[in-house]
Swiss-Prot record:
Source organism per UniProt: Methanococcus maripaludis (strain DSM 14266 / JCM 13030 / NBRC 101832 / S2 / LL)
Assembly and interaction partners: Homotetramer.
Designated name of the protein: Lactaldehyde dehydrogenase
Active-site annotation: E240, C274
PANTHER family, sorted: ALDEHYDE DEHYDROGENASE
Catalytic activity from the UniProt record: (S)-lactaldehyde + NAD(+) + H2O = (S)-lactate + NADH + 2 H(+)
InterPro entries xrefs: Ald_DH/histidinol_DH, Ald_DH_C, Ald_DH_CS_GLU, Ald_DH_N, Aldehyde_DH_dom, ALDH-related_metabolic_enz, Lactaldehyde_DH
Record family assignment: Belongs to the aldehyde dehydrogenase family.
Task of the protein: Involved in F420 biosynthesis through the oxidation of lactaldehyde to lactate.
Keywords attached to this entry: NAD, Oxidoreductase
Length: 465
């Protein structure tokens, strides 16, 4: 759609407002040959990015942050319309994006190698870019997750082809316009950054297969991640995939705090968050109290128009997604789950649901990606850990306890990429390592760590003459 400094404008794909269901935009869908061309252009410009000084890369990122900051309200509103995210959550996403850009700018100047002692001469290392980064991003955080890939790519001197989700591409288009403006202002050829909109089956597939792409950075579903991993052959990949993230609540914890955390975290962005609470594993002595607090907190939530400042939960990304959640609730109940509150659907809206389940229930095994909070009673921490680890996923886990010995023991036992103690799994800072084990992903994100992933270490040895 934006290739080699030129916009390709067609009306190929309808984009809908998830709340009103109105058609808000028609966008270009690149075919395979156009996608190949976008990648070829990106590849031809990789030397330009490589040769930019660290201070110029820093300046690009800081200028993008500056322009974005001047349009914070516009971008927050666009996120809410594009995704259905409540406006107060969209504003937080914009702020986090600014942090990610500024951190990326910082690391543009911090790229450094090391000197290694040698009796026979000098050994040193230097960091170099990989070349072309294919960034494939999801709908749920269309601005922040894009900059988590674009920022480190630019910081390390890579050229970029960005493929946003076709479900919510509008934010990426406006971000690209800012990048275009900055590159033009700095007299840098616009072909160093290209935007490839369209269907993932074509555009994303070509990016993952194309030999001119040196690394694919993908955030999305396990199924697509596995496909990318197979297609990528020997190219580098980072995959940030899904999870059924457990939150363990022990009897010695602050039960009210745990309940508030579970509700706030589970229903963020209507549950459409990869690190959303998948299930809460509660010791039997306190499960009744915990459940009471959860229902009280859930009743306080306001469901509705994402542009209303009082709204806590907006729509899912589409009516089809909401129907899938409605059917999951029905299946859970048919398997013995007890629906305690919520679960009513109207178009793309689903009222937040709380369900008592057991380990064999469908909700204990999958990533729901919607506003369902399953509660599962356990005898003790050992059973909780066993259930949590009996999963193909391993993204993040939460643990509530006031016993530091329990906390450290369970943190060691849990098979997850991140363990949040006295917090839900839904915790992330933009500079912490982030990623999962098992089928939840490969590699780590977080600006500092993505910079490492997107650069190569070259060793230089100078022998005594």
């Amino acid at each position: 759609m934006f290739i080699d400094g030129k916009w390709i404008i067609r009306e190929d794909i309808d984009v809908f407002d998830p709340y009103t269901l109105e058609n808000i935009e028609k966008i270009t869908a690149l075919d395979r040959e156009e996608t190949k061309n976008a990648i070829e252009v990106t590849e031809k410009h990789k030397e330009i990015m490589k040769n930019l000084s660290p201070s110029k890369r820093y300046k690009i990122l800081m200028k993008v942050a500056e322009h974005l900051s001047s349009k914070k309200d516009f971008f927050a509103k666009t996120i809410s319309i594009d995704v259905g995210k409540p406006i107060k959550q969209s504003k937080i996403e914009v702020d986090r994006t600014l942090t990610a850009l500024k951190l990326s700018a910082f690391y543009a100047k911090e790229l450094r190698g090391e000197t290694i002692n040698s009796e026979n001469g000098l050994i040193f290392t230097k960091k170099e870019p990989l070349g072309v980064i294919g960034a494939i991003t999801p709908f749920n955080f269309p601005l922040n997750l894009a900059t988590h890939k674009i920022g480190p790519a630019i910081a390390t001197g890579n050229s970029v082809v960005l493929h946003p989700s076709s479900k919510a591409p509008i934010v990426a288009i406006y971000l690209t316009k800012i990048i275009e403006h900055v590159l033009k202002q700095m007299d840098i050829p616009r072909g160093v950054f290209n935007l490839a909109t369209g269907n993932g089956e074509i555009v994303g597939d070509e990016i993952s297969k194309n030999d001119n792409v040196n690394m694919v950075s993908f955030t999305g579903s396990v199924e697509v991640g596995e496909s990318i991993s197979k297609n990528a052959k020997m190219k580098k990949v980072t995959l940030e995939l899904g999870g059924n993230n457990p939150m363990i609540v022990l009897k010695d914890s602050d039960i009210k705090l745990a309940a508030k955390s579970a509700v706030k975290s589970k229903f963020l962005n209507a549950g459409q968050v990869c690190i959303s609470v998948g299930q809460v594993l509660v010791e039997e002595e306190v499960v009744e109290t915990f459940t009471k607090y959860v229902i009280e907190e859930t009743k306080k939530l306001i469901l509705g128009n994402p542009l209303d400042k009082n709204t806590d939960i907006g729509p899912l990304i589409s009516p089809e997604s909401a129907l899938r959640i409605e059917n999951l609730i029905k299946q859970s109940v048919s398997e013995g789950g007890e629906l305690l509150i919520g679960g009513n659907r109207q178009n793309s809206l689903i009222s937040p649901a709380v369900i008592n389940i057991d380990e064999e229930n469908i909700l204990s095994k999958i990533e729901t990606f919607g506003p369902i909070l399953p509660i599962l009673t356990v005898k003790d921490s050992e059973e909780a850990v066993n259930i949590a680890n009996n999963s193909k996923y391993g993204l993040q886990a939460g643990l509530f306890t006031n016993n530091i010995n329990n906390a450290m023991k369970i943190a060691d036992e849990l098979e997850y990429g991140g363990i949040m103690i006295n917090s839900s799994p839904t915790f992330r800072k933009d500079n912490m390592p982030f990623g999962g084990v098992k089928k939840s992903g490969l590699g780590r994100e977080g600006i500092k760590y993505t910079v490492e992933e997107m650069s190569e270490t070259k060793t230089v040895v100078i022998h005594n003459i």
